């Protein structure tokens, strides 16, 4: 057989093998993983390799590490979305969990795709603190509040991020007239007073949270600005 004919036959065979890939393989959801922010734990995924997203539905299950039986997530059983909120099912931040997703399309069902082991305490990302400022003469009183969590205590109030992590707050102040930024505070207190500001100048305050254990920091907060009379 001529070389070019053999090459053409090989390509045809490979193409046919790909096109006739079993549905349970070609429909299998991809990139199934948890994305967690402030302990709000959302399972995300992408459609299978066959790219049959139109008309496809998904089924979601979850379990705690060490448990034998998977549990259905009713709100995401037959969903057309590419995500599922599993916050209520993964409330213990120290517990490791798994999630998995199956896809159905045109009467065919994929295999399950499982996440890596997910522990919220290790993997959640923190939003910046909420910053409020009050001017008192030539000083600024800065109050910092960590982001709210989905967990509630026995009185029904949201628990603080400080219940789970040692947090360090970093506050910077920007002199808009000089376009100069400098650190004003770094520590664990959530109430800070910045003194000695120059009259007739505009200042902005920005803050972030730092987790020493993970050497990890949050994004910076929105700037809060004020004019010193």
Curated annotation (Swiss-Prot):
Signal peptide residue numbers: 1-19
Lineage of producing organism: Eukaryota, Metazoa, Chordata, Craniata, Vertebrata
Subcellular location: Secreted
Main localisation: secreted
Origin species: Rattus norvegicus
Function (record text): Receptor for IL22. Binds to IL22, prevents interaction with the functional IL-22R complex and blocks the activity of IL22 (in vitro). May play an important role as an IL22 antagonist in the regulation of inflammatory responses.
Gene Ontology MF term list: cytokine receptor activity; interleukin-22 binding; interleukin-22 receptor activity
Name of the protein this chain belongs to: Interleukin-22 receptor subunit alpha-2
Pfam family, one: Interfer-bind
């Amino acid at each position: 057989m001529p070389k070019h004919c053999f090459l053409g036959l090989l390509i045809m065979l490979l193409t046919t093998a790909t096109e006739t890939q079993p549905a349970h393989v070609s429909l299998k959801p991809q990139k199934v993983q948890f994305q967690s922010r402030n302990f709000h734990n959302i399972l995300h995924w992408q459609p299978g390799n066959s790219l049959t997203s139109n008309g496809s539905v998904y089924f979601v299950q979850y379990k705690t590490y060490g448990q034998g039986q998977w549990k259905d997530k009713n709100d995401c059983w037959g969903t057309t979305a590419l995500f599922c909120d599993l916050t209520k099912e993964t409330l213990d931040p120290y517990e490791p969990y798994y999630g998995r997703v199956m896809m159905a399309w045109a009467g065919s069902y994929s295999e399950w795709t499982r996440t890596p082991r997910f522990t919220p305490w290790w993997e959640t990302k923190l939003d910046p603190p909420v910053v409020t400022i009050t001017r008192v003469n030539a000083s600024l009183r800065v109050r910092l509040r960590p982001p709210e969590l989905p967990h509630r205590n026995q009185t029904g109030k949201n628990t603080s991020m400080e219940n789970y992590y040692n947090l360090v707050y970093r506050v910077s102040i920007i002199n808009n007239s000089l376009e100069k930024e400098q650190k004003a505070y770094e520590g664990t207190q959530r109430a800070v007073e910045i003194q000695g500001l120059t009259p007739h100048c505009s200042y902005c305050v920005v803050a972030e949270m730092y987790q020493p254990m993970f050497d990890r920091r949050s994004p910076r907060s929105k700037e809060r600005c004020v004019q010193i009379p």
